[in-house]
Amino acid sequence: QRLLDGLRERGAKATFFLCGYRMEQYPDAMERYLEEGHELGVHSTVHTDLTKLTPEQLREDMAGTAQMIEEMTGIWPVLMRPPGGAYDEKVLREAEQEGMRVILWSVDPRDWATHDARQVLSTMAREAGDGDVILMHDMSKSSVDAALRLIDELQEKGFCFVTVSELAERKGVSMTAGSVYEDFKEK
């Protein structure tokens, strides 16, 4: 809740890629994500390497997670992020069949590997720029601290924080299902 409170206070938006088991743990957050203008996407059911699944297991995982999101919010997600960024042709085909765009990242502060908010913030502040997609996790206090401090620093420099779909639209990128996007920088 602290992350959502901080985003709201700063007028910042985010895209949250959700695991099924986490949605079950925090059902109240689902409605709040949408009420406050955030975007939701599929991560997986239990955070597994999607490339290791059979086509049937993959379909069950992706469609099942999407269905959970739809049942809780009324919206079918059009974005997905494979755990660890691991994807192959099978994952891309399934994403296309489910109508999902595959979103990776261009800045990874490795917040999942450390509990040092200063280190995470330093990496993000050094690497983040216009059109970047920043990978972060909302499961630790240090990640939330770093995210909110980064938003403060970059907003002071004129940056704004928007959802992935809004970023693509602002940059004139028409995303297509089954395609992979790491950033939306001017090429």
Question: How does the language model describe each region?
Answer:
Residues 1-53, 57-75, 160, 169:
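Active-site beta->alpha N-cap acidic-glycine motif
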Residues 1-2, 26, 48-76, 84-130, ...:
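Alpha-helical scaffold elements lining the catalytic groove of polysaccharide deacetylases
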Residues 5-14, 24, 142-187:
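C-terminal domain-boundary segment and adjacent tail
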Residues 7, 16, 40-43, 65, ...:
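Conserved, mostly hydrophobic/aromatic
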Residues 17-21, 44-45, 81-85, 105-108, ...:
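Active-site-proximal beta-strand/loop segments in catalytic clefts of secreted hydrolases
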Residues 35-39, 73-76, 128, 178-187:
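Structural recognition of alpha->loop->beta junctions
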Residues 45-48, 63-69, 133-140, 152-161, ...:
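A broadly tuned preference for mixed-charge, low-complexity surface segments
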